[in-house]
Swiss-Prot record:
Function recorded in the entry: Acts as a chaperone.
Source organism per UniProt: Staphylococcus epidermidis (strain ATCC 35984 / DSM 28319 / BCRC 17069 / CCUG 31568 / BM 3577 / RP62A)
A GO term for molecular function: ATP binding
NCBIfam families tied to this protein: PRK00290.1, prok_dnaK
Composition bias type Basic and acidic residues, residue spans: 525-542, 597-609
InterPro entries reported for this sequence: ATPase_NBD, Chaperone_DnaK, Heat_shock_70_CS, HSP70_C_sf, HSP70_peptide-bd_sf, Hsp_70_fam
Induction trigger: By stress conditions e.g. heat shock.
Protein name according to UniProt: Chaperone protein DnaK
Keyword hit for Phosphoprotein: yes
CDD domains: ASKHA_NBD_HSP70_DnaK-like
Gene3D superfamilies associated with the record: 1.20.1270.10, 3.30.420.40, Actin, Chain A, domain 4, Substrate Binding Domain Of DNAk, Chain A, domain 1
Keywords: ATP-binding, Chaperone, Nucleotide-binding, Phosphoprotein, Stress response
Length: 609
């Protein structure tokens, strides 16, 4: 097998690495830098990628940054009369990294391991694979960024068992994963995160502050000026980086705008304490997934042996302090947060090619997967934090008599109701032979491959007819959706429980109506017209109640119908017992006559003797 490169496709910066011997090596780009800005620019039909594209972003409106935030969505960028998808733009960045690796190796590269945030959903993972394909790369593996970081950190530490927390705050995404390392096995215990939180947001709070201060002083709103905003973005990013090393920085942007009396200049001094005040809510947002990951792993902070910081945003002193305070441990400083993920990807590439031996990586799926069932509920087949690859099957049936098809609504999330979770896809299994409800057996199978990509199959066990779908979602998970999936599951536990009970009640009532109809039909003439009429009335009353929203009324009507069916069952049972008893008496009478005859016959014989 040829060389397989490791790529960290980041929101703000990307990095490429290769395994040399048994050590991962980061490859410098033509400018001599070890990371490449994830920026693409178009000018007069020419495409520019990296530092050269970033440098002219202020003057060129056809510059695209942070496209990773739109992966897996239907977002498009219109430039010079052409629409570009996030996959196409990401492919341009990947092509640049591929070229960097080829120049270094002096050989063609066509295989790669690419990293993604652990909390990327299936559509986002698929989009990343597609970007690789467009770039001319066969994506051997999609690997989670925190897992890759742990591989790079722990490759030479496999003799001792330890539990590691990876805190990955990148340019546009945030992940936290907990792994157990030992005997060459890297097992992910849990993962949590936020796909819409990263360094860009820290830049934005500085931009908002600068816009606000400038407006107070000059009465001009810079947020309406695209070129001014780009200059502010560059200045904010630089100030953020400066404040990781110094306690105060000067932001100076001459000729940022113009007023009635001529040019206006922006001159603001920003202190580290002011920046920390502005970014406080963002830092707090990283703590909730950290606690969630610990909870899901079943670990306390004292059981964590090492904390690894990944991503450029972890250089912010306030972030480091927050992690230290939360975990009670000084973060490990032995890895480069900008390069460690790409290095881990190169190690995984080495595992695939066989160059790295005795290393086993066990990753997990970040969110639960299931399908919608009767009553609008989500039935979970694969729980979040399940080790992948994995497969799980469950048998379902039809909800109506002679139902010719079933709709399979594939969901991802943690809430009990389907509508509160993320739709990954829908497909239909048709040509189900006519049969009473509950009789057909439909086996639904979820397969998650090593890349975390989902394949769902539905099979009619009666006919062996099969239908499947590989999830290719067209929309990403927003902050609100992720909150609904994970955090709201706990916050709305009581409301969820009530809705779950309501759905269960409706399903039980619906099943009871069907049972009564079947029982009355089966009994036929064995029940009186009066009993039949009473059962029909109570059944119709429950059906009417089910059409309404009054839960207490449904419960009351259900109890009345249950009482009726119990009485019917009791009567039928009594009739059956009476019939059986009568049959036994008749049989007993016949048996008795036979015994008398035998007895007399014996007696006659004795008399003759």
């Amino acid at each position: 097998m040829g060389k397989v490169i490791g790529i960290d496709l980041g929101t703000t910066n990307s990095c490429v690495s290769i395994l040399e011997g048994d050590e991962p090596k980061v490859i410098q780009n033509p400018e001599g830098a070890r990371t490449t800005p994830s920026v693409v620019a178009f000018k007069n039909g020419e495409t520019q990628v990296g530092e050269v594209a970033k440098r002219q972003a202020i003057t060129n409106p056809n510059t695209v940054q942070s496209i990773k935030r739109h992966m897996g969505t239907d977002y498009k960028v219109d430039i010079e009369g052409k629409s570009y998808t996030p996959q196409e733009l990401s492919a341009m960045i990947l092509q640049n990294l591929k070229s960097t690796a080829e120049n270094y190796l002096g050989d063609t590269v066509d295989k790669a391991v690419i990293t993604v945030p652990a909390y990327f959903n299936d559509g986002e993972r698929q989009a990343t694979k597609d970007a690789g394909k467009i770039a001319g790369l066969e994506v051997e593996r999609i690997i989670n960024e925190p897992t890759a970081a742990a591989l790079a950190y722990g490759l030479d530490k496999t003799e001792t068992d330890q539990k590691v927390l990876v805190f990955d705050l990148g340019g546009g995404t945030f992940d936290v994963s907990i792994l157990e390392l030992g005997d060459g096995v890297f097992e992910v215990l849990s993962t949590a995160g936020d796909n819409k939180l990263g360094g860009d947001d820290f830049d934005q709070v500085i931009i908002d502050y600068l816009v606000s201060e400038f407006k107070k002083e000059n009465g001009v709103d810079l947020s309406q000026d695209k070129m001014a905003l780009q200059r502010l973005k560059d200045a904010a990013e630089k100030a953020k980086k400066d404040l990781s090393g110094v306690s105060q920085t000067q932001i100076s942007l001459p000729f940022i705008s113009a007023g009635e009396n001529g040019p206006l200049h922006l001159e603001i001094s920003l202190t580290r304490s002011k920046f920390e005040e502005l970014a406080d809510s963002l830092i707090k947002k990283t703590m909730e997934p950290t606690r969630q990951a610990l909870k899901d792993a079943g670990l306390s902070t004292s059981e964590i042996d090492e904390v690894i910081l990944v991503g450029g945003s972890t250089r912010i002193p306030a972030v480091q302090e927050a992690v230290k305070k939360e975990i009670g441990k000084e973060p490990h400083k032995g890895v480069n947060p900008d390069e460690v993920v790409a290095m881990g990807a190169a190690i995984q590439a080495g595992v695939i090619t066989g160059d790295v031996k005795d290393v086993v990586l066990l990753d997990v799926t970040p969110l639960s997967l299931g399908i919608e069932i009767m009553g609008g509920r989500m039935n979970t087949l694969i729980e979040r934090n399940t080790t992948i690859p994995t497969s799980k099957s469950q048998v379902y049936s039809t909800a109506a008599d002679n139902q010719p098809a079933v709709d399979i609504h594939v969901l991802q999330g943690e809430r009990p109701m389907a509508s509160d979770n993320k739709t990954l896809g829908r497909f239909q299994l048709t040509d189900i032979p006519p049969a009473p409800r509950g009789v057909p057996q439909i086996e639904v199978t979820f397969d998650i491959d090593k890349n975390g990509i989902v394949n769902v199959t539905a099979k009619d066990l009666g006919t062996n007819k099969e239908q499947n779908i590989t999830i290719q979602s067209s929309s990403s998970l927003s902050d609100e959706e992720i909150d609904r999936m994970v955090k709201d599951a706990e916050e709305n536990a009581e409301a969820d429980k009530k809705r779950r009970e309501e759905v269960d009640l409706r399903n039980e009532a619906d099943s009871l109506v069907f049972q009564v109809e079947k029982t009355v039909k089966d009994l036929g003439e064995n029940i009186s017209d009066e009993d039949k009429k009473n059962a029909e009335e109570k059944k119709d009353a429950l059906k009417t109640a089910l059409e309404g929203e009054d839960i207490d009324d449904i419960k009351a009507k259900k109890e009345e119908l249950e009482k009726v069916i119990q009485e019917l069952s009791a009567k039928v049972y009594e009739q059956a017992q009476q019939a059986q008893q009568q049959g036994q008496e008749e049989q007993g009478s016949q048996d008795s006559t036979v015994e008398d005859a035998d007895f007399k016959e014996v007696k006659d014989d004795e008399d003759k003797k």
